[in-house]
Amino acid sequence: MSAPAKRSSTDTQDKDLMLAADKDMEKDTWNFKSMTDDDPMDFGFGSPAKNKKNAFKLDMGFDLDGDFGSSFKMDMPDFDFSSPAKKTTKTKETSDDKPSGNSKQKKNPFAFSYDFDALDDFDLGSSPPKKGSKTTTKSMDCEEICASSKSDKSDDLDFGLDLPITRQVPSKANTDVQAKASAEKESQNYKTTDTLVVNKSKNSNQAALESMGDFEAVESPQGSRKKASQTHTMCVQPQSVDTSPLKTSCSKVEEKNEPCPSNETIAPSPLHASEIAHIAVNRETSPDIHELCRSGTKEDCPIDPENANKKMITTMESSYEKIEQTSPSISSHLCSDKIEHQQEEMGTDTQAEIQDNTKGALYNSDAGHSLTTLSGKISPGTRTSQTAKVQDLSEKLPLDPSHSMAGLDNLRAMQNKDLGLIRSRFFKKPEKPESHVLESSPIETEIQPVIRENIGSSLNPTNDTSSHEKIIHKDHSNGKTVENVAGQMDHLKLQAKNTTREKSILQINISSKLDASSLTQKLSNHLSSGVESLQKPKLNSLGRPKLGNIMADLRAVKTQRTIGGNKDQPSSAVQPEFSSSISKERNTEAPVKKSSEIHHLAPRDKTQTLHCPSSLKRKALDEDADRSLKPQLKRLSMSPRENRNVEELTHRAVQGKFSSQESRIDTKTTKEPVKESPQTKSHYQNINMANLEIPITENADNIEKAEAYTKELENICNILKKKHEEAKELLVRAVVDNNKLLMLNHPLYEDQISFL
């Protein structure tokens, strides 16, 4: 039947259905009765019509092209959405076509005929997919896909280079996808890499050892190729135990393809055996030394490829995940030319800068290969300190008569031979030199920068060793090596640059920590001799100098006297140091909080001469000229802390010096205000000012006037009392009169009033 005929037949069928529905609705309409009869509404339907030709049926096929015309077509050649042909009563089919029609009707109309197995042949490449090239078993496909996905995880790690990952040789039964993947992985196995791996935990180290052990265990008796890697490593471990264990390794890996029979084994050299044994002993005895796991041999084995691939992938994945969790790995691709260029640039550095924080030894990580080091140029002047540090490191390593002595001999032989070392651009000079000397007591470390003899000796290269050895042996009971002396020398040189800034802080700390008895004795011994000769002329000429400068001088006196009391320094050397410190601290130190701490000095002596700079003389003349115009300064009160420190400590030493001055002040009882002197102490000033009250002259005239005034006041008070009593009487009289006036309006009195 043609398309127009089909279209016309469907249109007529639709019209017939609509007409039949209209007729049924007319027959089965609701019967509305009149509301006047109060009958309920009848919503009942009539029975549906039976034996209708155009009745609606639900047993029609729900396919995409069932009731649509021929114009509705889907242009999808790859997908089969065709539905089975309908069986119509109008068309007559031959007996040959009936079996085919029945078979089509038996098919499930909801069946999706797309072949999902064709996805195995789907490829993103330019070549069209080849149908029929399926894998032998689905289990092989799943295993290979899992293996490739796991092995690709290692490529996602950002090592900065392509890590060599060995894959199994693909068999003939593998698909083209496996062949391409293995070819891509094989192309990455022939690269020379230089990596620097930093591991911060022991767990990652052990995991790496186990993973490489499993990796080395993969062997095949029929292997045709063997990939051996030569690794040259150097273990780096900082000496500080407080920080987290850090393992730094610089390894150069060279991949080589050597045809060799699979059953051949490589005999390890004696050097390698001794070093490996030494490493094992160090691993057991000293936990601070960490070794880099050696990368074992990697082999291609065609027999039993699945187990080998699984082991390789799991071990590599576990090691890389742990490395990624602990610390980011830094790696670079370096050639031999770049390494030589870096040696020339880094050649001026000393070996002590790298071995300053290292424990361990250089060892060969692969069996049967000679150990090579990259020699750097080192100045001959630094070899003595380097050898001393190497010996110090060798003493710290655990000693075993069978294994560790051989490893130490190898280490010394390698380091004495041109002092070779591995250099890389990742090893850089530390910004600040590290000191290995333990901190001494707080008082000793604070006093050392103040003494100028120690600072001068630290700056003088001739007597460095003698002076610093004395300091170190005083601070610590045990002897120190040359390395500790060098570290202390660097530490003191850095401190010598900031002496002016550190002086004030150290002096304040020392003055607060000094013993009260020692300070009192030293002040009483030296105030009369050296301090008075310097302080009296200044106070005489300046009158009232700035309290900040005097405070600085007094604090310098306290510090230098306590330091000068030591047995090591003679008393004669204290006086020039005291004068120089006063002249320097007056220019450098800021003025301190004003207080009357300096009042415990001796009284003025007018006969002494003035020894001060010209600037101070000029200030003194200006102050003397303007003294008559300026008001007198107020007495400054001290803080509670200074009252405790100064008054209690210097009370005994200064008590005798103020006896004469107290008697002199007590005799002067005049109306004039008592002048304050900077020599008197605030404590005694308060007592004297309380006792020295100015007497008031008793005047008879004033007393008589006061008595007369008191009498007058008493008289006025008496008069006021009398007036008050009189006022009360008047009030009573007024009340009585008012009552009488009110009684006049009473009716008893009206008759009497009317007669009048």
Curated annotation (Swiss-Prot):
<feature type="compositionally biased region" description="Basic and acidic residues">
    <location>
        <begin position="583"/>
        <end position="608"/>
    </location>
</feature>
<keyword id="KW-0175">Coiled coil</keyword>
<feature type="region of interest" description="Disordered">
    <location>
        <begin position="656"/>
        <end position="681"/>
    </location>
</feature>
<feature type="region of interest" description="Disordered">
    <location>
        <begin position="562"/>
        <end position="644"/>
    </location>
</feature>
<feature type="compositionally biased region" description="Polar residues">
    <location>
        <begin position="230"/>
        <end position="251"/>
    </location>
</feature>
<feature type="compositionally biased region" description="Polar residues">
    <location>
        <begin position="562"/>
        <end position="582"/>
    </location>
</feature>
<dbReference type="InterPro" id="IPR038777">
    <property type="entry name" value="At4g18490-like"/>
</dbReference>
<feature type="compositionally biased region" description="Polar residues">
    <location>
        <begin position="189"/>
        <end position="208"/>
    </location>
</feature>
<feature type="region of interest" description="Disordered">
    <location>
        <begin position="170"/>
        <end position="269"/>
    </location>
</feature>
<feature type="compositionally biased region" description="Basic and acidic residues">
    <location>
        <begin position="619"/>
        <end position="629"/>
    </location>
</feature>
<protein>
    <recommendedName>
        <fullName>Uncharacterized protein At4g18490</fullName>
    </recommendedName>
</protein>
<feature type="compositionally biased region" description="Basic and acidic residues">
    <location>
        <begin position="8"/>
        <end position="20"/>
    </location>
</feature>
<feature type="region of interest" description="Disordered">
    <location>
        <begin position="81"/>
        <end position="109"/>
    </location>
</feature>
<feature type="coiled-coil region">
    <location>
        <begin position="701"/>
        <end position="741"/>
    </location>
</feature>
<feature type="compositionally biased region" description="Basic and acidic residues">
    <location>
        <begin position="663"/>
        <end position="675"/>
    </location>
</feature>
<feature type="compositionally biased region" description="Basic and acidic residues">
    <location>
        <begin position="90"/>
        <end position="99"/>
    </location>
</feature>
<feature type="region of interest" description="Disordered">
    <location>
        <begin position="1"/>
        <end position="20"/>
    </location>
</feature>
<feature type="region of interest" description="Disordered">
    <location>
        <begin position="121"/>
        <end position="157"/>
    </location>
</feature>
<feature type="compositionally biased region" description="Low complexity">
    <location>
        <begin position="125"/>
        <end position="139"/>
    </location>
</feature>
